[in-house]
Amino acid sequence: MAAKEVVFGNDARVKMLAGVNILANAVKVTLGPKGRNVVLDKSFGSPLITKDGVSVAKEIELEDKFENMGAQMVKEVASKANDAAGDGTTTATVLAQAIVTEGLKAVAAGMNPMDLKRGIDKAVAAAVIELKNLSQDCADSKAIAQVGTISANSDESIGQIIATAMEKVGKEGVITVEEGQALENELDVVEGMQFDRGYLSPYFINKPETGSVELDHPFVLLVDKKISNIRELLPILEGLAKTGKPLLIVAEDVEGEALATLVVNNMRGIVKVAAVKAPGFGDRRKAMLQDVAILTGGTVIAEEIGLELEKATLEDLGTAKRVVITKDNTTIIDGNGEQAQIEARVSQIKQQIEESTSDYDKEKLQERMAKLAGGVAVIKVGAATEVEMKEKKARVEDALHATRAAVEEGVVPGGGVALVRVASKIADVEVANEDQKHGVVIALRAMEAPLRQIATNAGEEASVVANTVKNGSGNYGYNAGNDTYGDMLEMGILDPTKVTRSALQFAASIAGLMITTEAMVAELPKADAPDMGGMGGMGGMGGMM
């Protein structure tokens, strides 16, 4: 085991604070509408320009081991805030720096670190309750657009496109962000349930101009096995011929004689039919077939539950308003399943998402839920260059996380005002002694830090702005975008409650622990080995005969 270096007391805290400050100072220049960008060097490709706090924090690694420990702990604050709410990483970093700075001053003045931490924890617990009281629902499209705009660094086009996407696919729908090909942002919405399986034979195509199959008001047959014998399908096909309606078959596979007969019947116009493979594999396929069954009001024909294809009737089939099948995708629009059953299935999938530990499984479950609940929207980010594209895509992703958080827990006045108002309400929180009281004061001072930093980044005097806002009441705050004071909600400056709450909780949690540090241990830097001496030259070779 390598030798370790140990530093104690004030020496340890000074080193740790230096690391905290280096990281936080790099991150906090990005805060607010007039925050600046940070350029990150990449080992390959062009540098990345970003205004996202967590992206900056993740890049920072310091040479001094003890300073680096301080920086890494604040990096953890930003990462945790990002994981919980997807935004608010810069706010969390600013709060953590403020708590650590004030806390270490108090420790140096001889106060008890453990009591300081208890005081900070009590203040934060009270602040979280007050934030909930201050919070308002974010229900309408206008409020969603405002939250998106603020999170995307006051870019209204991003806020608007996210609000439109949410309106189209619902709050449970999936919205993904991709790099587009054009200069402008684009929104693609797939309504209904789409899965990535196309037609099994091009002879099913009935719209040659688009190369697709379109079925109006079709029956949907769902089978969890391969179909190779046409005899199994005859009862269903005979029943269908009488109704004159088209049929979509979704099965593990349709092959051989069965596929050939379906194609012939389709081309002769006896039965209008199309067949596709079931989506997914193994257990996921079974689950997705069941999703389609619930969406269309049908039954999955599976031998393991005692249902045979030969004995299936029209009662077992689902129905939909329309089905569109291309070479690669099948889309079922307006399935006729019962709304109550669909909602029950969605809440069952929600439960599975909460219990799942795998990110991949969560993503797949989220997709399934979206397809049942509303649809899938894709925002294609447009930009002139790759560097701008990456920067813009990161902002769109942040804005998307912020709007989701806003829909979940509501919104509070933005621009750092919510924390200032909360601080004024919890000043008299109950504590056991003077040191705990000072811990509360540290937390209250830290809650002003985001507002002060927004003002500083806008080129204003932080103390003047903070006092003006503190003397106001309710939603009154400072709009750094146009250098005016007024009602933040009316000006459309909103922060998601979840983002503000998460930032405060994670910052206080880690900063509180840092204040209580008394010793730090790190590996000694290895001394460089001496260079190898140069090799002696080779003697000249004699003349050759």
UniProtKB/Swiss-Prot annotation:
Q: Which GO terms describe its biological process?
A: protein refolding
Reaction(s) catalysed by this chain, per the record, are: ATP + H2O + a folded polypeptide = ADP + phosphate + an unfolded polypeptide
User: What EC numbers are recorded for this enzyme?
Assistant: 5.6.1.7
Cellular location(s)? Cytoplasm
GO CC annotations on file: cytoplasm
Enumerate the CDD domains for this protein.
Answer: GroEL
- Keywords for this entry? ATP-binding, Chaperone, Cytoplasm, Isomerase, Nucleotide-binding
- Residues binding ATP are 30-33, 51, 87-91, 415, 495
Which GO MF terms are attached to this record?
Answer: ATP binding; ATP-dependent protein folding chaperone; isomerase activity; unfolded protein binding
Enzyme class, one word? isomerase
Matching InterPro entries: Chaperonin_Cpn60_CS, Cpn60/GroEL, Cpn60/GroEL/TCP-1, GroEL-like_apical_dom_sf, GROEL-like_equatorial_sf, TCP-1-like_intermed_sf
Q: Which proteins does it associate with, and in what oligomeric form?
A: Forms a cylinder of 14 subunits composed of two heptameric rings stacked back-to-back. Interacts with the co-chaperonin GroES.
Q: Which family does it belong to?
A: Belongs to the chaperonin (HSP60) family.
NCBIfam families recorded: GroEL, PRK00013.1, PRK12849.1, PRK12850.1, PRK12851.1
PANTHER family, sorted:
60 KDA HEAT SHOCK PROTEIN, MITOCHONDRIAL
Summarizing the function annotation, the protein's role is: Together with its co-chaperonin GroES, plays an essential role in assisting protein folding. The GroEL-GroES system forms a nano-cage that allows encapsulation of the non-native substrate proteins and provides a physical environment optimized to promote and accelerate protein folding.
Q: What is this protein called?
A: Chaperonin GroEL
Instruction: Name its species.
Output: Shewanella sp. (strain ANA-3)
